[in-house]
Amino acid sequence: MRVFLKRSWYGNRGLEMKASAEKVIPVEKTPSKKKRILIIEDEYSASKFLTMRLKNLGFMVSAAFDGMTGLKEATETIPDLIILDLMIPKLPGEEVCKTLRESFDEKLVRIPIIMLTGKDSMVDKILGKVIGADAYLTKPYDFSDLFEVIKKILPDA
């Protein structure tokens, strides 16, 4: 699993460590403001798992099960982060990402996007970077790896 980030990597400011079944993962002490995460994932069980885990960590989470609904939700709520699958119905993840990055609304352009997908080829990873994803993770993934990327993208969460 390879991850790339356009943004700076940040340390574990104000975080404590909590043991989990997977690995030791950082947990926020007292969030100053809950961060909003939008999950755009067509697999219900994957979306539900992510929603549950992220809510337990103090995030406000909403989910969309296709690209068109996800894009609409993003424009209406302006989340702090989007976790986006590439292979979703109605509007592929690549198009959702490109549409947000090419928007005239600066708030939409600046939303960090983590691609979380089963597409593991080097071409797909390069495409993710070219269209503006902040990170690219492949399925299957370890939740603690995803959480580490989230904390680096949203250091104040």
Model region roles, listed by residue range:
Residues 58-65, 73:
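Short hydrophobic/Thr-rich beta-strand motif most characteristic of the beta2 strand and flanking loop
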Residues 89, 121, 140:
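The feature encodes the CheY-like receiver
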